[in-house]
């Protein structure tokens, strides 16, 4: 056996060992064993509070993060309001949306939004879903949400629109919820290689490679919607060109630690 083959086998064995440990351990046990898991879960809790404070979610809405010690599972709160989520509320799921570790608490019904995107987009590690009212008119009218300023440059050439009627079974008259793996996959397919998708008559989903970045994108997509709506009342809107959007995204997303610091301090104040 060559040295390279031996190293590959050893690495694969280590990955399997980590995955086995993670699937057998509770979230708290994983936090005790893996510093990266502890950091991810604690940041996930903080993100729930920030999203609520910034009106990206309300009593409904949720955020997930991929397990840094096992990319085939993710963490998401049990079914409670984002503003009250604590570490002990975090559950672990596989990429089919099944709760792990024998956890029988009630999960979010739309956890398949997260499983669908995280399974199909290995570059995305965190997903947000919410129902911000500023975004809804775009999905209702077919008006494309496009970047109007540098903070929302990640919208690129415009956010795609998920039309659940095209995928709901057995009839197109669904309850509008992404409540099963097939609909989660359909939503992920609509998202494609982008980072933000609108859901007609429902809300939005955002993705990023980190919790901080997906929170940033959620908040500034909502702000973009408000600005774009106002600008459209005044006349022809000058959107960012594809080149401007690409350049602005690269620049602004190097600085997301700054608003994260602000938002964190705001939710930590008594």
Functional labels for PLM-detected ranges:
Residues 9-20:
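Bacterial N-terminal signal peptides
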Residues 24-270:
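Glycine-rich flexible loops
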């Amino acid at each position: 056996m060559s040295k390279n083959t031996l190293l590959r086998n050893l690495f694969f064995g280590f990955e399997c060992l980590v995955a086995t440990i993670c699937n057998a351990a509770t979230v708290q046990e994983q936090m005790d064993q893996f510093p990266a898991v502890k950091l991810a879960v604690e940041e996930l809790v903080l993100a729930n509070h920030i999203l609520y404070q910034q009106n990206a979610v309300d009593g409904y809405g949720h955020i997930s993060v991929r397990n840094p010690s096992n990319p085939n599972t993710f963490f998401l709160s049990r079914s409670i309001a984002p503003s009250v989520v604590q570490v002990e509320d975090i559950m672990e799921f596989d990429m089919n949306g099944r709760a792990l570790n024998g956890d029988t608490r009630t999960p979010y019904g739309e956890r398949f939004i997260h499983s669908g995107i995280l399974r199909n987009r290995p570059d995305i590690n965190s997903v947000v879903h919410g129902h911000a009212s500023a975004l809804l008119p775009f999905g209702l009218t077919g008006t494309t949400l496009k970047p109007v300023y540098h903070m929302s440059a990640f919208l690129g050439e415009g956010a795609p629109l998920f039309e659940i009627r095209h995928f709901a079974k057995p009839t197109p008259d669904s309850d509008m919820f992404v409540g099963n793996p097939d609909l989660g996959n359909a939503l992920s397919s609509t998202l494609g290689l982008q980072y933000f998708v609108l859901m007609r008559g429902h809300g939005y989903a955002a993705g990023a490679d980190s919790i901080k970045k997906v929170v940033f994108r959620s908040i500034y997509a909502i702000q973009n919607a408000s600005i774009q709506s106002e600008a459209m009342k005044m006349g022809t809107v000058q959107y960012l060109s594809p080149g401007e959007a690409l350049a602005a995204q690269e620049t602004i997303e190097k600085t997301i630690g700054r608003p994260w610091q602000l938002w964190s301090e705001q939710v930590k104040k008594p």
